[in-house]
Amino acid sequence: PKFHPALRHAAPARKELGVSTIFNVLGPLANPAKPVAIAVGVAKEKFQPIMAEVLARRGCEGFVFRGDEGIDEISLSTTSTVYQVSDGKYRIEKFDPTNLGIESSPIESIVGGDAEYNVKVAKEIFAGKEGQLAML
């Protein structure tokens, strides 16, 4: 629903399933604004080249990334596979946060909690409180 109003009808069923569906991939690709630049994460490795190819054919510039432990974000606990899309083509790169001097953190150290806990942590970070989560 964030990217295309027509997909809002699938939202209740997707939420009830509680797992990733094809709509996780279709959503960003169905964006009616047709962005010329995009950065999008995918959790399933098999979808990375598909999404990169679609973006390349559309003339988009951007990145399709996946943390190599299977998250749809750039990882701080391991390397990430990044498809860089530009000029109608894409190339695959590995991103290692330690190459930038960022200390590796186990995935367990950055996993949030329930909504109440996450709000508490966000408020602490915005208030300037220092700590492990604030340093991410």
Please name every model-derived segment:
Residues P1-L136:
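Glycine-rich anion-binding loops and their surrounding alpha/beta cores
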